[in-house]
Every structure is written in structure tokens, then in C-alpha cells.
Amino acid sequence: MESRVLSRTTAIAALPKLFRPSREAASFGFATGVKTPVGLVKDGGSLTWGRQLRPVLLLEPVQTGPVCSRREKTAVQPCRAASGSSGEAKTGFLEKYPALVTGSFFFMWYFLNVIFNILNKKIYNYFPYPYFVSVIHLFVGVVYCLASWSVGLPKRAPMDSKLLKLLIPVAVCHAIGHVTSNVSFAAVAVSFTHTIKALEPFFNAAASQFVLGQSIPITLWLSLAPVVIGVSMASLTELSFNWLGFISAMISNVSFTYRSLYSKKAMTDMDSTNIYAYISIIALFVCLPPAIIVEGPQLMKHGFNDAIAKVGLTKFISDLFWVGMFYHLYNQLATNTLERVAPLTHAVGNVLKRVFVIGFSIIAFGNKISTQTAIGTSIAIAGVALYSLIKAKMEEEKRQMKST
């Protein structure tokens, strides 16, 4: 009898002990802060209170707060991994292919620029007032920015005195480059202006080395030589050549070079969309006084009346509005592209854009060009292509050295 009692006692002692959790833990499945004897877990584990009869091993040690059991943890992990992989599939495409995004920026930049240049030159054919048209370009862009800010697309970034000091020289360079470019567009053929402005990589390289102190390899300098030679050949035999158009295009090269360099510095504090919006506002105030002084009297006397008499009031206003919209949008995309690439790469892309503009402008306006001008333009474009290949190869070598 005694042995039978002892055997029952031993059998009962060998069974796993049951722990009734608190009501809060039982209802939500959360572990409490009560310490569980490690020996009980080792012997067979604790049983979750209720209908579940199989032992569930608790984590060792048990933490306070919501902690899942090992059984629950192993059951949840695959779902969590699947969810994560699904999220990566949805959001990781653009991150996996950044070159595709940058390429789309370049394409839209080129497309809008071609439309702008064709419409802009058509306006100058019946309304030759580049200072006033430059103001209209910026004014339409500023109205667009204010309307976008009012609906939160994008959200307006606050302006402080430090950033304002950075943006003022950028806006001044932008205003000077914009006005001088339009003076050149009004004076000579669009194709010739863009041929002169193909020298922008040369000015960017010079500014990067002598202003920013960056070392430019001799091979890059040599690759820019065909660009200079080609532009010189094209200039000597350009049928629409005049010094006003040539000098204005050269001044715009210098101005836009400094704009690119200082814009890159300013982007550390604000996104490119808001930066260009503030630049447009400041540049508008910079361009307005010269337009009033230089062209104001002529516009009031006969400029507006002549344009309305030639094309009508509706078309005149419509042309000014759309040329301003295309100008703002293509410059906004150019600024967004600059945010993704280095200034020199941006300059090269700018020159390749001119290939499209030159080609489409010749087709649209039927401009006659001499054989030497065509050869010079081709040499300049080939020089830019050579420069791009050398620059890309150097950047790839730098990335490989950093990875090793």
C-alpha cells in the first residue's frame, strides 16, 4: 500500500506543473513579469491555460511586456519575411535601377527644351524683345511655383538667412545667364547659339579646378580640345553670325557654370524643387529692372501693338504663357537632374541636349548651314562624346578602388 502511494506521488511529481496566468495575460496572450523556474521549462515546460494541452516553451528568461512564445515566434517569422520581401519588390525597383530614373530625367529635360527653343524663337520672329520675354519666362514659373506651394505639391520649405545668402549668387547667375541666352537666341539662329553654348563643359572644368580646387586630369582637358575647335570652326562660317549673339552666348556659359557649382552647394540644405522655386523668385526681381529700363519705352510705344497686329492678342498671350511654362518645367527637370549627378556630368548632358535642339531647330526653321559649320558642330559633339567616355571610365575606376 505504501509503495503504491509512493508510486502515485512520484508519478504526479513527474507531471508538468500548470501555471494559471493573470487575466490580462490570458486574454491577450502576453507574458507577465513573473519569473518562471528554469527547471520547469527544462522538465517539460509550462502549459498555456485553457484548452491547449500541449506544452509551450517560454522564452528564457521571460521579459516584461508583450513577448511571443517560441512556438508563436517560429510561426510568425515566415510571414514577416514574406511581407518584407513583398515590400522590397514594390519599393525597390527604382532603387535597383537608378540609371533608369536618371535617364528619364534627361529625356524629359531634352524633350521640353526642344519645344521651348522652337516656340521661343517663333516668338522672337514677331516680338524681338528678349529682356521682356525673359521676365515672362520667370513670371510664369513663379506663378506656377506659388500655385504648387498652395496645394502642397511640393510642400514649401522654409527660408532662412543662411540659405538666402547661398541662393542670391545662384539666382543672380541664373538671371544673367537667362537674359544673355535670350539675347543670343533673338540675335542669331538657335542652332548657332547652342553650338557656342556647347563650350559649357570647358567652363565647368575650368571652374571646378580653379574655383573649387578640384583636380581635373590632363586627359579630360585634352578631350575638350575638339569641342573648342569644333565651335570655332562653326562660328567662322555661320551665316547668321553677329557679335551680339556670340558674346551673349559666351556670357551665358560663364553664368550658368557658376550657377551649377553654387546650386550643388545649396542642395545640401533643401530639395532641388524648392531651391529652383526660390531661385526663380529672386531672379525675377533681378531681371525686372533691366527689362523696364532697356525695353520699356519701346514696348509701350509700339512693341505690344506690333505683336498683336501680327498674330492677334489671343495667340500672343498664349505663346507667352506656354513658352514660360516650358521654360520653367525644363529648368526644373534640369535642376532635379543636377541633384542626381555631378556638375561636370550635368554639363555633358547639357551639351548632348543641344544635339537634339540643334537638329530639331534646323528642321523646324529650315536654317541653312554651311559645310564647315556642319563639320565644326559635328567635331564639337564628337569631343563631348569623347569627354563623356573618359569621365565615365575614371568614375568607374574610382568606384572599383573604393570597393576594394
From Swiss-Prot:
Keywords: Chloroplast, Membrane, Plastid, Transit peptide, Transmembrane, Transmembrane helix, Transport. The N-terminus is blocked. Residues 1-74 form a transit peptide. Pfam families: TPT. GO terms for biological process: transmembrane transport. Residues 75-98, 153-209, 295-372 are chloroplast intermembrane. Its main location: plastid. GO terms for cellular component: chloroplast membrane; Golgi apparatus. It comes from the Eukaryota. The chain crosses the membrane at residues 99-119, 132-152, 210-230, 275-294, 373-393. Residues 120-131, 231-274, 394-404 are lumenal. One of its GO terms (molecular function) is phosphoglycerate transmembrane transporter activity. It is a multi-pass membrane protein. It is found in: Plastid, Chloroplast membrane. InterPro entries: Sugar_P_trans_dom (IPR004853), Tpt_PEP_transl (IPR004696), TPT_transporter (IPR050186). Belongs to the TPT transporter family. TPT (TC 2.A.7.9) subfamily. Mediates the export of fixed carbons from the chloroplasts into the cytosol in the form of triose phosphates. This is Triose phosphate/phosphate translocator, chloroplastic. It comes from Spinacia oleracea (Spinach).
